[in-house]
């Protein structure tokens, strides 16, 4: 098939044949091959190449990147060969591969090899045309698939150099060493190829971090290799290219020659890191520490890029989440963990069984805020103390130092092992060894760590630093062991500096707060409901009206640690009252307006600045927000100017303007527009730039000036006065020449063709190439200098961290007080009255959470408990009558009062309770091999050990896990002990009517019987019960369990049988009691002198009837 007339035939174009030799042509003898001309014929031959290229192109206007001219020696003379166009080169490559395949398929003894080679060189014109057409179609197919020779790939690689150093290095790292052609008749060895230089780097880094998923930066992507690729593909739903998954030379993978791999774009790094971290993985980021321009100027230009593990992330240490810094509140659907990482260690257990004791130390760190909590304590065989601290702190990660006892290990597994646990998500657990001399080694390690801090402290801070150091060195041994392990652990993530913030060390067991143990947090639903473990329906959800994230975190601490100091409580509740009543309307609106303007988590932002991990736009936003906060109340000079009488409000407002001077000082160094656009080169104002930055900027300016001066020189070569530079596809300083102009014939051979279209060609002169390389080197050095100066600025701001953090804490206090004031302004809430007496007197109290979730109105009830009067209530009533809701309501009102909140009631007088204990619900503990009844009694035993006369104790149906006689006996003994010995305020729920007789044992009314009221209608099968949900005096002698069975839709025949059996049992018991009464009367009649025991028996029999 002949070519169209517009194209010369292949056979009639010796120029084409001469300019497009294939690689195989150098190894195949060709008869009468014309000698290659050594003369420089200018760009004329290229025109023919361009015509062929244009013919093969799908789009005539598409940019084509030209290869670089190559120099070869022929017969001792240097020859400059004009390179082929990319498409022609691809055609020749196809010919080469075809030739190689043909050579491999021939027999060595075949006499026709030479003949066939000669015949191939003497193809007629039509055969060559057909071959070219096939190659043209194949080339289009390759282009559609984006092969290695496609125009897009070549265009990206040719940026001012013969080949992009970065991409060339990637190719060198990925490609294995070419294997020599196997001798004929021998099979090639499968797999087991040499590792590429980059794969050797990966293995070297991976061997040091086998527990970490590594993301390796390779050019424009981050790649996973081996087993990491399989995990990433599963978690991120990305493609995994098959290959070796193991990092050792295992025989099972001997047939594979490449690692399995997966990749993500550079700009999506933190999106995917966040997903991997949330799934519980430890993730490491390995970055290239060299850039293409600097590598080109260095001595190791042919070596692979230097790579290093720069960042390691886990759930608690992932502080680079920019999204979490934005938004006013953490409106998560579930009740997630608090971001703490908790380190725990314990000594060997002492004792056995129920007498087992362990000595435990903990240190919990919140890297995102800088808070640190520590404690040392003894715990019993139920591990209730450990459970309490775990539920309060709610860590998302745990570090276990040494071996734990069996009971502790089971508790940790139970609380952290499931995604639907009380922490809201699965907890990541790591382990660290513990030496026999751990205490001494830890003291030495901690001392050296804080001694270095003291060396760097200013002279003015020496005394403060010394006091803080003494405080740290005075920590108990178990806490010091945990602190040492935490320092080592946080150093791995580059966050060890957070442990230098000793001002924020807090002791967990401080007696300035009410104790809420693990059972209480769960039973009263303080942080989470017991249905789906979300925050909705919890006490925290009810109180939370905060507008900032740092305010929300502070309120969470307030809820979990109610105050014991009456004066502090009154200050807080008076502040809430002032904000609620709008006594100073203008100032209240200013506070609310200021809180509403804050859209970033300043507490997390400040700690990121402290770590040196803050971005430029984020730094600008934080400083501008802090400036706005400080300026809002800059006119306040004294507490009287605030207009508030409450010290809590006035002190918080007074502390806000103190940071204004420092914040303005830092902002004056920053170019606002550049910082907002994340422009590192112009981030600093000109007068604030470092000498290094200025030097490299001048260097870039000098190079750009030389490039401008080169324009006339380049124009002279083309016969013009001056050329105009153009920029195309990110490539600058291109000299553009029209293909149909006379200038195209004047282009020197030394000029490098970078790209072109049908109408124009674009070139770089050798001088431009050299100057662009110099400019790029200056740019890379400038970028490093800008990063260095930015880190120095963050370090300078970090010296004022505590002052800035105190300002944020003051703002958080105002946010919490405004939140409580918003709640207090709702109808039916009252300010509680506080007293030093141990009492709870509430009129028309309501359940704070249930009334918000119910569509109907909640039925209020009174409660009167006093240590000097009635201090215990025995609560009875029908099933589903509201007993548990009533006792929970009492406990929640007491806790709300000591938080400093208004309470849902008409009136409330509250004493200072030191703890609230609950024993509610029935469940077993299969992990510990304990039955339901064993769990009940163990928890009750813990309460009896810890309760004091100032505690509130709630016991719900104690003794139901065993037989009636044993259950009644245990319940009666526990209740008697609580009222007589411990003298706590007690609410005791039971269905044992026999216990109601205990009130006669307390003639002064320390124990009273109350019941949940109800009304009956109908008789027999038509009996109907209406729950009134009101508390009344006396005892409910029936539980009406059959009514609940009917509501549960049990089968009708079953209900009838149950009614019949219930009636028979009641009649039997009634006859027995009647017989007992008759016997008691007979005993009185027969005895001449009725002693007290006989009289008591008679009275008891009458009450039973």
UniProtKB/Swiss-Prot annotation:
Location in the cell reads:
Nucleus
Recorded GO MF terms: ATP binding; ATP-dependent DNA damage sensor activity; double-stranded DNA binding; mismatched DNA binding
Q: What are the boundaries of the signal sequence? A: none
Q: What is this protein called?
A: DNA mismatch repair protein msh3
Q: Which domain of life is it from?
A: Eukaryota
- Which amino acids does the record list as binding ATP? 877-884
Q: Which organism is it from?
A: Emericella nidulans (strain FGSC A4 / ATCC 38163 / CBS 112.46 / NRRL 194 / M139) (Aspergillus nidulans)
Composition bias, Polar residues: 74-84
């Amino acid at each position: 098939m002949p070519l169209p007339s517009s194209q010369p035939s292949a056979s009639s174009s010796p120029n084409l044949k001469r300019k497009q030799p294939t690689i195989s042509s150098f190894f195949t003898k060709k008869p009468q091959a014309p000698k290659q001309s050594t003369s420089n014929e200018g760009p004329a031959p290229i025109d023919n190449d361009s015509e062929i290229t244009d013919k093969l192109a799908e789009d005539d206007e598409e940019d084509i990147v030209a290869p670089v001219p190559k120099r070869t020696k022929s017969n001792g003379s240097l020859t400059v060969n004009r390179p082929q166009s990319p498409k022609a080169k691809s055609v020749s490559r196809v010919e080469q591969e075809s030739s190689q395949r043909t050579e491999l398929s021939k027999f060595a003894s075949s006499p026709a090899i030479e003949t066939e080679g000669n015949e191939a060189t003497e193809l007629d014109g039509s055969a060559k045309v057909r071959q070219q057409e096939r190659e043209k179609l194949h080339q289009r197919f390759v282009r559609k698939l984006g092969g290695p020779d496609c125009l897009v790939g070549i265009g990206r690689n040719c940026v001012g150099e013969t080949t992009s150093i970065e991409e060339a290095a990637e190719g060198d790292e990925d490609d294995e060493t070419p294997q020599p052609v196997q001798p004929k008749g021998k099979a090639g060895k499968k797999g087991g190829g040499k590792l590429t230089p980059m794969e050797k780097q990966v293995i070297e880094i991976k061997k040091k971090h086998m527990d970490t998923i590594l993301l390796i930066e390779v050019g424009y992507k981050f790649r996973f290799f081996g087993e990491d690729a399989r995990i990433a593909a599963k978690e991120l739903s990305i493609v995994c290219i098959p290959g070796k998954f193991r990092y050792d030379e295992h025989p099972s993978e001997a047939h594979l020659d490449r690692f399995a791999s997966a990749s993500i774009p550079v700009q999506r790094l933190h999106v995917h890191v966040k997903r991997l971290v949330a799934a519980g993985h430890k993730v490491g980021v390995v970055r290239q520490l060299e850039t293409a321009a600097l590598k080109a100027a260095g001595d190791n230009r042919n070596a692979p890029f230097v790579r290093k593990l720069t960042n390691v992330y886990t759930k608690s240490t992932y502080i680079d989440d920019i999204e979490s810094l934005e938004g006013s509140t953490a409106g998560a659907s579930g009740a997630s963990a608090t971001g703490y990482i908790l380190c725990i260690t314990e000594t060997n257990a002492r004792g056995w069984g129920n007498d087992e004791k362990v000595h435990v130390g903990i240190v919990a760190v919140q890297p995102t805020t800088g808070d640190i909590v520590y404690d040392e304590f003894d715990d019993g065989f139920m591990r209730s103390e450990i459970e309490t601290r775990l539920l309060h702190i709610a860590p998302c990660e745990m570090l276990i130092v040494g071996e734990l006892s069996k009971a502790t290990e089971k508790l940790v597994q139970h609380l952290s092992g499931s995604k639907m646990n009380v922490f809201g998500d699965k907890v990541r657990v790591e382990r660290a060894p513990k030496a026999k001399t751990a205490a001494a080694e830890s003291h030495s390690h901690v001392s050296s760590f804080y001694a270095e801090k003291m060396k760097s402290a200013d002279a003015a801070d020496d005394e403060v630093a010394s006091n803080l150091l003494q405080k740290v060195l005075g920590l108990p041994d178990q806490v010091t062991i945990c602190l040492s392990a935490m320092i080592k652990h946080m150093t791995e993530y580059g966050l060890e500096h957070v442990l230098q913030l000793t001002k924020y060390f807090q002791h967990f067991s401080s007696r300035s707060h009410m104790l809420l143990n693990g059972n209480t947090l769960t039973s009263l639903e303080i942080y989470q409901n017991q249905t789906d473990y979300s925050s909705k329906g919890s006490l925290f959800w009810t109180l939370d009206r905060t507008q900032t994230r740092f305010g929300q975190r502070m309120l969470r601490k307030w809820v979990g640690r109610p105050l014991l100091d009456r004066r502090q409580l009154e200050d807080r509740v008076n502040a809430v009252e002032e904000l609620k009543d709008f006594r100073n309307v203008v100032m209240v609106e200013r506070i609310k307006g200021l809180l509403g303007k804050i859209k970033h988590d300043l507490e997390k932002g400040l700690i990121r600045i402290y770590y040196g991990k803050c971005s430029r736009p984020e730094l600008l936003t934080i400083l501008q927000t802090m400036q706005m906060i400080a300026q809002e109340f800059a006119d306040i000079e004294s507490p009287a100017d605030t207009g508030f009488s409450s010290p809590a409000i006035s002190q918080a407002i007074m502390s806000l303007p103190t940071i204004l001077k420092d914040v303005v000082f830092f902002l004056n160094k920053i170019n606002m527009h550049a910082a907002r656009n994340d422009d590192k080169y112009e981030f600093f104002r000109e007068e604030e730039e470092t000498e290094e930055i200025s030097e490299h900027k001048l260097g870039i300016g000098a190079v750009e000036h030389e490039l401008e001066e080169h324009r006339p020189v380049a124009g002279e070569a083309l016969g013009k006065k001056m050329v105009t530079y153009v920029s195309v596809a990110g490539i600058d300083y291109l000299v553009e020449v029209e293909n149909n102009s006379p200038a195209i014939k004047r282009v020197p051979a030394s000029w490098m063709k970078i790209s072109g279209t049908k109408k124009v060609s674009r070139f770089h002169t050798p001088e431009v190439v050299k100057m662009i390389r110099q400019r790029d080197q200056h740019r890379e050095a400038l970028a490093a200098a800008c990063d260095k100066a930015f880190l120095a600025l963050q370090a300078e701001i970090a010296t004022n961290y505590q002052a800035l953090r105190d300002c944020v804490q003051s703002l958080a206090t105002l946010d919490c007080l405004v939140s409580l004031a918003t709640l207090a302004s709702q109808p039916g809430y009252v300010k509680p009255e506080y007293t030093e007496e141990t009492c709870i007197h509430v009129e028309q109290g309501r359940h704070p959470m249930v009334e918000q979730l119910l569509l109907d109105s909640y039925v209020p009830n009174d409660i009167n408990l006093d240590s000097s009067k009635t201090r215990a209530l025995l609560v009875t009533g029908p099933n589903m009558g509201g007993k548990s809701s009533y006792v929970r309501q009492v406990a929640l009102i007491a806790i709300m009062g000591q938080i400093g909140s208004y309470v849902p009631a008409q009136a409330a007088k509250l004493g200072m309770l030191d703890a609230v204990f609950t024993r509610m619900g029935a469940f077993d503990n299969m992990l510990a091999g304990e039955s339901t009844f064993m769990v009940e009694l163990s928890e009750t035993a813990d309460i009896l050990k810890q309760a004091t006369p100032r505690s509130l104790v709630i016991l719900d149906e104690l003794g139901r896990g065993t037989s009636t006689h044993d259950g009644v006996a245990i319940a009666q003994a526990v209740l008697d002990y609580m009222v007589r010995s411990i003298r706590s305020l007690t609410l005791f729920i039971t269905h044992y009517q026999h216990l109601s007789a205990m009130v006669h044992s307390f003639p002064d009314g320390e124990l009273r019987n109350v019941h949940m009221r109800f009304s009956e209608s109908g008789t027999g099968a038509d009996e109907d019960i209406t729950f009134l949900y009101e508390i009344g005096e006396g005892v409910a002698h029936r539980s009406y369990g059959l009514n609940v069975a009917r509501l549960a839709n049990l089968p009708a025949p079953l209900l009838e049988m149950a009614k019949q059996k219930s009636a028979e049992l009641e009649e039997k018991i009634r006859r027995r009691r009647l017989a007992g009464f008759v016997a008691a009367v007979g005993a009185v009649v027969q005895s001449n002198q009725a002693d007290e025991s006989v009289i008591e028996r008679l009275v008891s029999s009458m009450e039973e009837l």
